[in-house]
């Protein structure tokens, strides 16, 4: 999650959604009576026909829910403001919030609890180093909360200078990129460019950095204009989502190893996890997204458990359906905890 802006006077937070966990956090902090500003679509009658029209509205929140089988948060409420010509103020509406969307949340007063959850989620976001490369130039940058920092912007030697110059230039870019990776320790690298030179650089990077995930994409130029272009793409959100899924897979692998060697350090099932939480024993909990998908007593119980885990500095990992560990976890009741210490 990125906190794009917080207006203290209006008590308004503008957010960019980057992962399933972000949607879950919003599900927890949105309350009845809050207002949200977001883009949506609605069927509008045009004479004898109707058409789905895109628009930005202000919605007074009634309740929220996860929609089954999609990475989506549904926000139900009453339209407080919308373009006058559509005549839909006061109507019921549902905003579908997806990964990659932006939303403004306005509260009467943000509680310290809700603000802390937002800030904690923003601090969790993975770091990406972006390298735009072409035969004659390259640019390296890293996104931060406050904006994009250009780390390097240089020209490369001309292809006409000598034989083997492409490989030499690729090594030059990869070597400098590796230095920044060591300095900033990003979770992933995005290499983009207009031609095949990016693949040459990727080979060198993979030789130097064995354990960093490298994503490759195309962009029109290795310039600041190209950087602006890539930042508007869905690739950034995909990388964030992939990273969250990879973290879950590693934790599940750890849990399976413990089940085989030290089974007393793992517990699963709602009641068992709840008991472990009450004893302050939970280090990490993994749960499938289905458990937060509907308005029922089980979901409310799970939300209370997760709140207790956070208060006791435990880690929570929400596992989406596209995760490779989803069905494995579902077969273990859908909720599993790795423990800090043995309990009876």
From Swiss-Prot:
Monomer. Its EC number is 3.1.-.-. Its main location: cytoplasm. Gene3D superfamilies: 3.30.1330.30, eRF1 domain 2, Pelota, domain A. This is Protein pelota homolog. GO terms for cellular component: cytoplasm. Disulfide bonds: none annotated. May function in recognizing stalled ribosomes, interact with stem-loop structures in stalled mRNA molecules, and effect endonucleolytic cleavage of the mRNA. May play a role in the release non-functional ribosomes and degradation of damaged mRNAs. Has endoribonuclease activity. It is found in: Cytoplasm. Keywords: Cytoplasm, Endonuclease, Hydrolase, Metal-binding, Nuclease. The keyword Nuclease applies. One of its GO terms (biological process) is nuclear-transcribed mRNA catabolic process, no-go decay. SMART domains: eRF1_1. Belongs to the eukaryotic release factor 1 family. Pelota subfamily. InterPro entries: eFR1_2_sf, eRF1_1_Pelota, eRF1_3, Pelota/DOM34_N, Pelota_arc, Ribosomal_eL30-like_sf, Transl-rel_pelota. It is an enzyme of class 3 (hydrolase). The lineage of its organism: Archaea, Thermoproteota, Thermoprotei, Sulfolobales, Sulfolobaceae. It holds the Pfam family eRF1_1. Its cofactor is a divalent metal cation. One of its GO terms (molecular function) is metal ion binding. The N-terminal domain has the RNA-binding Sm fold. It harbors the endoribonuclease activity.
